[in-house]
Amino acid sequence: AAHGERVGVLDLTRGEAASTGSAEIREQEAARSAEVMGLAVRKNAGLRDSGLMNDDASRGVVVGLIRELRPRVIVTHCREGRHPDHRVAAQLAYDASFLSALKNYDAPGDAHRPEKVVHCLLFREDAPPPSFVIDITDHFETKMAAVACFESQFSGKTAAGEVFGGNARSLEDQIRAQCAHHGSRIRRDYGEPFWTRETVALESLGSDGVSTF
């Protein structure tokens, strides 16, 4: 959003099955984080929390929202994850992106296909090597402020979502450490890794911006 792109978030569930907080609290937290990130839109698909399915009904809902929002790029979960919803979300987003372009697919709106589906890799211990790492140094504190909005999920925690526990470091410290590690891979302070099915093109051999030495 800081670079002038129109950015939105589609939450697939309301978090009603979570151990902490409630769907109503999560909705308030999502609204605060949207303001922090400068989102153009934030919507909720209202699918079942902790029971997310990549079935015809769910694909129809997501296709309708893709056709409404008409994104150029979709960023979703890693294809592997410890939360079943996260694994399903990755494939659901991919399948819905394809189906959305089918003119006669039974869902609201006019056909539309995003150009890319990109998968987040942060915190996955079994992730493939990233296709690329984005320099988030200038926006890292905004990222942390957006995460902090979700107090019911993350406040006082050392593990949440895809972040495994096992040490005394706060969730904030673990996020900083992970992003600093990936930043070092591109010779920057902080970075975020992503993976795509397709090959990433470069203009020339030296255009990736990362020095060998």
Where are these regions (language model features)?
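Active-site rim/loop-helix segments in enzyme catalytic domains that contact anionic ligands
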Residues: 1-69, 207-208
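Metal-dependent de-N-acetylase/amidase catalytic core
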Residues: 55-213
